[in-house]
């Protein structure tokens, strides 16, 4: 039987001669290989009778006339969700092999856009703005490419559910990537602009209800991430599962004016009171600019209850300016919320970074600490710190190490940049 020829399905909100007046109707007719071409106009429940989520079938390309020209307006449709964060509570749901390009996607009550778990998708040249929860939810894709988009003011419902650990789990990222068990989890995020998120500009995590052994690789390249109410980038190899294997490359981004951290990476950060063990995070942070946050780049081996987790971090060639506390901060393990952190490790190379106006202490490396009186034992940082340009501080070191609580250690490889080893226990701060 001969293969079906691909079709072009045209949608217009204003041209009465167009075959379709709503995107919903055209997508119901589209099959793999088809392109749904959407003319200028506002497409919404009240204007064109849209039904959300708009499901883009496998292999279908949905193309608008450009940002600001073709607008998909949710008018507050869809709901926030947590544990799980639901892909179906999104204005647009992308099937495997589908593409979304050339739209302003606005005003969803839940998420703006999501992929079906495991789907390979391309999301490019869109504006994604003012959604109640996340701008874009990426769940376990075979491969997702997210390129040349503008994200603005996502997390409008200011949703901050309490996690089982009794801490606030802010929801409202521009892009929320969740690694899924048994899936490929390959994501490329490049050339995007992300401004004013309620939580983080970009969060990449293995969520706490996944099975053990999740593998994920994310590349974050040449993005602008700014003015997030919490962090620019959050990276967590595990919020609960053990044996995760996560690799994240962060290169040539500008990350500025975020409240807490520019980049915070954690091999294990339990959000429920269950032990995480042997999760590995490899994070490579090269040639970024980080400006004006609480801390610049922070690496954490494992929080309690965590044991035997490893973060392998490379921080090279970055410009870090205007931090209130530290430009680079590394801690092997942190006892947390009544639970111990034991035998977690960070291996770190910190080299050829330029630090300006760094606040309290430009580079600070600590073996083990605790939030209150929790145990932290056997945690270790093995670091090579060399050839960084650091400001001179009157009466204070520019680079210091502290073993922390008894039974933890920081080891520096030679050659090592001039530093001070601080005695006693330096208190942990979030």
Question: Where does each model-flagged region fall?
Answer:
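Solenoid scaffold repeats with emphasis on beta-solenoid/beta-helix
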Residues: 36, 54, 60, 70, ...
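Right-handed parallel beta-helix/beta-spiral solenoid domain characteristic of secreted/periplasmic
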Residues: 5, 13-17, 40, 44-47, ...
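Beta-strand repeat architectures
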Residues: 27-34
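Extracellular beta-strand/beta-solenoid scaffold signature
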Residues: 48-53, 75-92, 107-114, 130-138, ...
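Extracellular/surface-exposed low-complexity segments
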Residues: 2, 388-390, 403-430
